[in-house]
Structures are given as structure tokens and as C-alpha cells.
UniProtKB/Swiss-Prot annotation:
UniProt name for this protein: UPF0309 protein GTNG_1302
Taxonomic lineage: Bacteria, Bacillati, Bacillota, Bacilli, Bacillales
One example GO MF annotation: carbohydrate derivative binding
Alphabetical list of PANTHER family matching this protein: PHOSPHOHEPTOSE ISOMERASE (PTHR30390:SF7), SEDOHEPTULOSE 7-PHOSPHATE ISOMERASE / DNAA INITIATOR-ASSOCIATING FACTOR FOR REPLICATION INITIATION (PTHR30390)
Residues annotated as transmembrane: none
Length: 249
């Protein structure tokens, strides 16, 4: 199974590169433009999808102005089954998204592989209503195979400005075995993280080519990194309070 899993992951990545490259470039241009215009990059996902938002936040070699929206009841550590129940609730999203600082100069990524649950859809609609450029990382195969749970009947890919297909299969699990009754081994987190890092890398290059110093974190385990990073944190701490939460003034 080890070889098969790596093979399947490579197949998904090749599909993304082949079919989504134009949209990856569009996303990178939007990110580059947002940062140059004083905006930030915001990300939201429920359950395991939040892992991708965390992957690119405060990341060595990553873009500084990245703000994940963490809603703990929608993550896993406060109750896994409960988090799924809440994600399926219509009108739950306003309880947290309405108080978020989302601006028209921002880019907002919504991460949901199935794309059918109300909370990610409502978050996308809220971000769009505030003028942000919305990008979904989702699976079109998966989404189109299942009915929406949103009261409007729409799926995530139908409400955003740009869609990047992660090419996950229906149900996300990619492997089978004759003695196992259900498919297993998901791909969406690995592929989604690659998509995000590729988009941000391209955006960093675009800024540099435009004569703009890209705000990039150095690894905190490299000597001199604290001084380098402190300058960028100071610049973005008001828009991204989670960068300094819990620190002494």
C-alpha cells in the first residue's frame, strides 16, 4: 500500500498541474495584487480542511500576511462528531464570520473538499459580500456527486470567484483492498497543501519581479531570523492579531 499511496498522490498532483495551472496562476496574481495593495490572505476550513490553513500560517519560507480563521468548535479537538454536526448547520457561520475583519483588498480561500456543507458556503458568501476575492479549493468530482446541504441548494464551487479543483475522488479515499469494505487513504490534505504553497510561491516571485520586497518569514531556528521576522510581524499584527496573541506587550 505504501507504493500505491505515493503513486496515487503523484497522480493527483499531476492532474492539478495539468488541469489547474491557469487557475493556480490566477490565484497567485490575486494574492500578489492583494499584498501589494495592503490586503492580506485569509483562509478558512472546517474539520481536517483547517489543517491547510494552518500549514501556510506563520510558516518558515511562507508569506507573512496570512490569516487563518480558527473556529475551535469546527475543528476536531473539541469534539469530532460535533464539529461535523456544526458544519452542516445553516446559519451557524454568522456566529463567527460576521466579526472577522474582511476587506475588499483581501483574498479569501475557502477550503472544503466536498463543498456541500453550509458553513464553508456561508463563509464564502460572507467574504464575497465584504468585497474579498474568494477562492475555493475543492473537489469538483466529489461536489457534483452529492446534493448540497445549504439552504440555497448551491455548492461551494458555485458561489466563489475562482475554483481550484484538488482532483480528490468522491469520498476523498483513494485506495481499496479486497479485504476492506470501504475505500481508505485520503489525498485532499496533501494535495491542498501543495496547491496553497505553489500559489503563494508564485505570488512571492511575482512581487519580486515587480520590484516589491515580498514579506516572507525566515525559519525561527536560523540565527538572525527573529530580527527579520519581527519587522514583518510589526507591520501585520493589527490585521492578523493571532500572530501575537498571548505575547507580553
Amino acid at each position: 500500500m505504501i507504493d500505491q499511496y505515493f503513486q496515487k498522490i503523484n497522480e493527483r498532483l499531476k492532474l492539478v498541474l495539468k488541469h489547474e495551472k491557469d487557475n493556480l496562476k490566477k490565484a497567485a496574481h490575486a494574492v500578489s495584487k492583494a499584498v501589494q495593495n495592503g490586503g492580506i490572505i485569509q483562509l478558512f476550513g472546517c474539520g481536517h480542511s483547517h489543517i491547510m490553513a494552518e500549514e501556510v500560517f506563520y510558516r518558515a519560507g511562507g508569506l507573512v500576511p496570512v490569516k487563518p480563521i480558527f473556529v475551535e468548535p469546527l475543528m476536531l479537538h473539541e469534539g469530532a462528531v460535533r464539529s461535523s454536526m456544526l458544519e452542516r448547520m445553516n446559519d451557524f457561520a454568522p456566529s463567527f464570520i460576521d466579526r472577522e475583519d474582511i476587506r475588499s483588498e483581501d483574498v479569501f480561500f475557502i477550503l472544503s473538499t466536498s463543498g456541500r456543507n453550509p458553513v464553508p458556503i456561508d463563509v464564502a458568501l460572507a467574504a464575497k459580500a465584504k468585497g474579498a476575492y474568494t477562492i475555493a479549493i475543492t473537489s469538483l468530482e466529489y461536489s457534483k456527486s452529492q446534493p448540497s446541504r445549504h439552504k440555497s441548494g448551491r455548492l461551494l464551487y458555485e458561489v466563489v470567484d475562482l475554483v481550484i479543483d484538488n482532483h480528490s475522488v468522491k469520498g476523498d479515499a483513494i485506495l481499496t483492498h479486497q479485504n476492506v469494505s470501504v475505500p481508505f487513504a485520503p489525498t485532499s490534505t496533501v494535495v491542498g497543501s501543495a496547491i496553497l504553497n505553489a500559489v503563494l510561491a508564485e505570488a512571492i516571485a511575482l512581487m519580486a519581479e515587480n520590484g516589491v520586497e515580498p514579506p516572507v518569514f525566515l525559519s525561527g531556528n536560523i540565527e538572525g531570523a527573529d530580527e527579520h521576522n519581527r519587522r514583518w510581524i510589526e507591520k501585520y499584527k493589527e490585521r492578523i492579531p493571532v500572530l501575537i496573541e498571548g505575547c507580553q506587550p
